[in-house]
From Swiss-Prot:
Residues 4-23 bind DNA. The keyword Chloroplast does not apply. This is HTH-type transcriptional regulator LacR. The gene is lacR. Coiled coil: none annotated. It comes from Lactobacillus helveticus (Lactobacillus suntoryeus). Keywords: DNA-binding, Repressor, Transcription, Transcription regulation. The keyword Ribonucleoprotein does not apply. One of its GO terms (molecular function) is DNA-binding transcription factor activity.
């Protein structure tokens, strides 16, 4: 069994300091460099193998990357940030927020790890630089570099398949999909996982995918535009239901449908993803798959703590399932 005395001897700090750190003494005042060095030695000597019941309280950073031009999408990530801040306060952790990755890179020595929130693109070269100076990181909802960092994400493929199965159970076989394009990574436009899953799963079920409309950013404005495009092409041949990739898009689509006197859920039904606050107040209120943000934050912090004390383990990507919150846009009779 590795002892505190051995860690103190190799790290060059007193046994009292080491003991207070490893036992989460709230009154201990030491620099981040000191904390990092002690934890590094504890990891190297295998201290945690004999003390698996202990849970350290690291000093962490929040890397927050959002596009403030899109209010509803911004609200989703703002809510994630608020959940993280509240949880950090509850658990008596220390956290500082960074809005620019270069600032975090410059200050990396002050932290044991970071949580990433937001969907704004980051250059791969910057992520590599960050990993060199702060390798312990967990991204929430997205992961721009799964080969470098951990992530906790909603299980979107499961959600899409669940939606299709639910429609089919309720006798709906003409199903459309409205979505935006995926994120850019090093200037390369990726396809969105929701649209990929929709097309592939529909084909495995032998169902028509002609009502698939994927274009542009995830925004209310683009949702409105896509709603108009769908109606211009298919108003006399609407599917029985649409799955829409996010509430942000769904609000715009619903506005376009209302303007063209398309009655939801009579003429076509709608299922959406995210279950943001606004979907309760549109007309009709949207049935939407809920993403449990608090659970994602709790899992992210647990994963980060585990990574800090097990830095040599492989990176992990955890997918969390969603649950449907039923409102008036689609009320399933069979679940």
């Amino acid at each position: 069994m590795r002892t505190i005395k051995e860690i103190a001897l190799e790290s060059g700090y007193s046994p009292a300091t080491v003991s207070r750190l490893l036992n989460n003494d709230p009154n201990l005042s030491i620099t981040a460099d000191t904390k990092n060095k002690i934890l590094e030695i504890a990891n190297k000597l295998g201290y945690w193998e004999d003390h698996q019941e202990k849970k350290i309280k690291p000093t962490i950073a929040l890397l927050y990357r959002v596009n403030h031009n899109e209010q509803l999408q911004d609200e989703y990530f703002t809510s994630l940030k608020q959940a993280l801040v509240s949880t950090v306060e509850r658990d008596a952790l220390k956290m500082k927020t960074f809005y620019d990755i270069e600032d975090l890179i410059k200050n990396a020595s002050l932290f044991q790890g970071f949580i990433g929130v937001g969907a704004e693109p980051i250059e791969n070269a910057q992520l590599v630089k960050l990993h060199k100076v702060l390798p312990n990181g967990v991204f929430v909802d997205t992961n721009p570099a799964p080969e470098l960092f951990d992530s906790i994400r909603p299980n979107l493929p499961f959600t899409v398949k669940n939606a299709i199965d639910l429609f089919i159970k309720n006798g709906i076989n003409k199903i459309g999909f409205i979505g935006g394009v995926g994120p850019k990574h090093d200037h390369i436009q990726e396809n969105d996982l929701r649209s990929i899953t929709f097309v592939e799963y529909m084909k495995t079920r032998g169902m028509d995918t002609k009502w698939t409309c994927v274009e542009g950013p995830v925004s209310v404005e683009n949702g409105y535009k896509l709603g108009k495009m769908v109606l211009a092409k298919y108003k006399n041949d609407l599917p029985e239901a649409f799955l829409i990739a996010s509430d942000t898009l769904a609000v715009g689509v619903l506005q376009a449908f209302n303007e063209e006197n398309v009655n939801v859920p009579k003429d076509t039904k709608i299922l959406s993803i995210n279950n943001s606050n606004v979907v309760k107040y549109v007309s009709p209120p949207l049935s939407s798959f809920n993403i449990n943000q608090q659970e994602m934050i709790d899992m992210a912090l647990d994963t980060l703590t585990h990574l800090i004390i097990r830095p040599d383990r492989p990176n992990i990507d955890i997918r969390m399932n969603t649950n449907l919150v039923v409102r008036k846009s689609f009320v399933p009779q069979e679940k």
